[in-house]
């Protein structure tokens, strides 16, 4: 089940709010400029499906987002517990960073924890299958895929380079709860 946990940035041990209804999650995130929607990921995706197969299965939704927001690059990130670089990738994504463009993810399968550091608050968004999240450009955040990752997500970008992070050097992510496997 998708969820949103809100903390004050200096109190990672004490949540201010815990939400589990999609409408409540979406409205709370909308207040800080983050888009969250539930989509029907009804197209079957076989285990080990190629990037092209995943993109083809969701072509209608992808094209709508591209038209709506001007995204030009689409790819698929797919990680599971057998991935040889899972520990290195997890460590990289767990460092607080920002992007010069929106970070858009549509979860086709599995789950991941997007944690957003906005002003004095931290918003931990557990995204699962059928969740779309769009994090505005410049938003400090990190992502946890867990020790035993399992997710497939479509990513959309405004630039042809794809995922380009600007790391903040802040160790705040180390003080907040991680995705529990």
UniProtKB/Swiss-Prot annotation:
Fe(2+) binds at residues 97, 99, 103, 141. The lineage of its organism: Bacteria, Pseudomonadati, Pseudomonadota, Gammaproteobacteria, Pseudomonadales. One of its GO terms (biological process) is L-methionine salvage from methylthioadenosine. This is Acireductone dioxygenase. It comes from the Bacteria. The record marks 105 as: Important to generate the dianion. Binds 1 Fe(2+) cation per monomer. The record marks 96 as: May play a role in metal incorporation in vivo. The record marks 102 as: May play a role in transmitting local conformational changes. Pfam families: ARD. Monomer. Coiled coil: none annotated. Catalyzes 2 different reactions between oxygen and the acireductone 1,2-dihydroxy-3-keto-5-methylthiopentene (DHK-MTPene) depending upon the metal bound in the active site. Fe-containing acireductone dioxygenase (Fe-ARD) produces formate and 2-keto-4-methylthiobutyrate (KMTB), the alpha-ketoacid precursor of methionine in the methionine recycle pathway. Ni-containing acireductone dioxygenase (Ni-ARD) produces methylthiopropionate, carbon monoxide and formate, and does not lie on the methionine recycle pathway. Its EC number is 1.13.11.54, 1.13.11.53. One of its GO terms (molecular function) is acireductone dioxygenase [iron(II)-requiring] activity. It catalyses: 1,2-dihydroxy-5-(methylsulfanyl)pent-1-en-3-one + O2 = 3-(methylsulfanyl)propanoate + CO + formate + 2 H(+); 1,2-dihydroxy-5-(methylsulfanyl)pent-1-en-3-one + O2 = 4-methylsulfanyl-2-oxobutanoate + formate + 2 H(+). Belongs to the acireductone dioxygenase (ARD) family. Pathway: Amino-acid biosynthesis; L-methionine biosynthesis via salvage pathway; L-methionine from S-methyl-5-thio-alpha-D-ribose 1-phosphate: step 5/6. Ni(2+) binds at residues 97, 99, 103, 141. Its cofactor is Fe(2+); Ni(2+).
């Amino acid at each position: 089940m998708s969820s949103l946990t809100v903390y004050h940035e200096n109190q990672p041990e004490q949540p201010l709010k815990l939400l589990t209804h999609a409408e409540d999650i979406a409205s709370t995130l909308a207040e800080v400029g983050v888009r969250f929607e539930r989509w029907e990921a009804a197209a079957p995706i076989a285990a080990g499906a190629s990037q092209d197969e995943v993109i083809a299965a969701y072509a209608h939704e992808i094209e709508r987002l591209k038209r709506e927001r001007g995204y030009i690059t689409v790819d698929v990130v797919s990680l599971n517990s057998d991935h040889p670089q899972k520990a290195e990738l997890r460590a990289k994504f767990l460092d607080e960073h920002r992007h010069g463009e929106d970070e858009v993810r549509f979860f086709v399968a599995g789950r991941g924890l997007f944690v957003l550091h906005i002003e004095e608050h931290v918003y931990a968004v557990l995204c699962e299958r059928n969740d779309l999240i769009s994090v505005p450009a410049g938003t400090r955040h990190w992502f946890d895929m867990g020790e035993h990752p399992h997710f497939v997500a479509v990513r959309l970008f405004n630039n042809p380079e794809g995922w380009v992070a600007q790391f903040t050097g802040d160790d705040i992510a180390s003080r907040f709860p991680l995705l529990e496997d």
